[in-house]
């Protein structure tokens, strides 16, 4: 693990790559005995892991080790008045699981009330969510699409999926949705989606939006995000993807609407980008997009 935080709130993280990590850690915890405990006869400097809100021990900062400084789950250790170790969250943590299980399983809302904070962040930073979704996928999100995604995010309670975090709000926004019609969808040129549409024989015409095209075909095809995946590699890096499918109506089934796959592909996404973006000071807000969030993303009861 390459970063830590200090509470269960959604807050800026402290990265081990920060040259002043030790000083910042000690300034933050002060003389709070909860963060420095004797565990099995050894002093442990503790914090929380942002992905699962479980206690972690800091390694390589206060005692030399053979690898770069990092954090590791502190199984069974509690930080008084901050957090209790949770085995269920540990089992679901990407840095324990190493791979996503692709199941849209819900967390019990009584167990993780901070999920309401996640929902609040999605609403307050919805223009950044849309911006990053566009940037990483190449899909131009119109205001109508932004409305549909906001409404679906609330209906599906996507903020309450087991793997949902502050980091992957943009990906869960589209992953929780059933799919958009490709007809007249606007796509940025030279992206993965653009290339796959060309390979599948879709007719793409230049859009009025610079550097983009739109899909001219109207055969009922959809673009749907089928999976959000992650793998933690041997260097402790979290690699993430969105899996997409292009599907079209099955012409052999006439009595109901069913689809068949035309193509499948994956797009790499960077979750760390969003956590940095929400703290960016010089952001130019898109008020129309924020107004959509205000209309559709009402306070949770």
Where are these regions (language model features)?
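N-terminal cysteine/histidine-rich coordination modules
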Residues: 1-113
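Intrinsically disordered, low-complexity N-terminal extensions of nucleic-acid-metabolism proteins
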Residues: 1-8, 116-124, 232-238
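Residue-identity detector for threonine
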Residues: 7-8, 23, 38, 53, ...
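Helix N-terminus capping/helix-initiation residues
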Residues: 15-17, 138-142, 261-270
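Histidine (H) residue identity feature
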Residues: 40, 45, 70-73, 96, ...
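Domain-exit/linker segments immediately C-terminal to small folded modules
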Residues: 74-186
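Intrinsically disordered, low-complexity regulatory regions
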Residues: 147-301
